[in-house]
């Protein structure tokens, strides 16, 4: 079973991935996790990160160029994802294809039914062959709370300076709205929307009931 955890920067995705992994293991399931972008492992991801911190000229100003870099990062992990899915009962991804659709649409002031989201779906799923997730879980929190967490994370870790996307509060708000639309229309497969107070054990049981094989 392939599960993608989605949400704006600072939503708490990493924490949810850790807690959900623990819940699945407690239920007797084997679990693997993978986070995107794969900074430090993927040239495409590293170039994107550098662009979001002011390098590479005007690269970051191009929505489609940045989206392509993030897509190529995931494309480079296709075989890794497939291997994990064969070797484990549950594979949990911290961000996946929907993040590209949400941020790209938000940057262009489009909604989930716009050209950017449709393009991401064609490029990543159809052209690059990314496997579709069995579930996409949207961790829906307020933009204010996400912003506070993002700022706090940067203060605690001097090496984790916020990038251009993370510093743009209006972009984060628009991205959250697009995410909600993607979930409502079932973009790319099944969605489940949860809040910051979600119980990991109950979430695991909903995503993969104990009597249903992964």
Curated annotation (Swiss-Prot):
Mg(2+) binds at residues 9, 166. Competitively inhibited at the phosphate acceptor site by 3'-azido-3'-deoxythymidine monophosphate (AZT-MP) (in contrast to other TMPKs such as E.coli, in which it is a good substrate). Inhibition seems to result from the impossibility of magnesium binding. Its EC number is 2.7.4.9. Disulfide bonds: none annotated. Pfam families: Thymidylate_kin (PF02223). One of its GO terms (molecular function) is dTMP kinase activity. Pathway: Pyrimidine metabolism; dTTP biosynthesis. CDD domains: TMPK (cd01672). It catalyses: dTMP + ATP = dTDP + ADP. SUPFAM superfamilies: P-loop containing nucleoside triphosphate hydrolases (SSF52540). Homodimer. This is Thymidylate kinase. It comes from Mycobacterium tuberculosis (strain ATCC 25618 / H37Rv). The gene is tmk.
């Amino acid at each position: 079973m392939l599960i993608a955890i989605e949400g704006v920067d600072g939503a708490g995705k990493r924490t949810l991935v850790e807690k959900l992994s623990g819940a699945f293991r407690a239920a007797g399931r084997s679990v693997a996790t993978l986070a995107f972008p794969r900074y430090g492992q993927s040239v495409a991801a590293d170039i994107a990160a550098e662009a979001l911190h002011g390098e590479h000229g005007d690269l970051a100003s191009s929505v489609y160029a940045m989206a392509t870099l993030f897509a190529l990062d995931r494309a480079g992990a296709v075989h890794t994802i497939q291997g994990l899915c064969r070797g484990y009962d549950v594979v949990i991804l911290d961000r996946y294809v929907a993040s590209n659709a949400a941020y790209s649409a938000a940057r262009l002031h489009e909604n989930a039914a716009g050209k950017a989201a449709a393009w991401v779906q064609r490029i990543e799923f159809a052209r690059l062959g990314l496997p579709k997730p069995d579930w996409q879980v949207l961790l829906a929190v307020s933009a204010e709370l996400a912003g506070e967490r993002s700022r706090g994370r940067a203060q605690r870790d001097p090496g984790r300076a916020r990038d251009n996307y993370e510093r743009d509060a209006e972009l984060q708000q628009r991205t959250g709205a697009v995410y909600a639309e993607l979930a409502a229309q079932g973009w790319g497969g099944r969605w489940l929307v949860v809040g910051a107070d979600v119980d990991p054990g109950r979430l695991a049981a909903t995503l993969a009931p104990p009597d249903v094989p992964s």
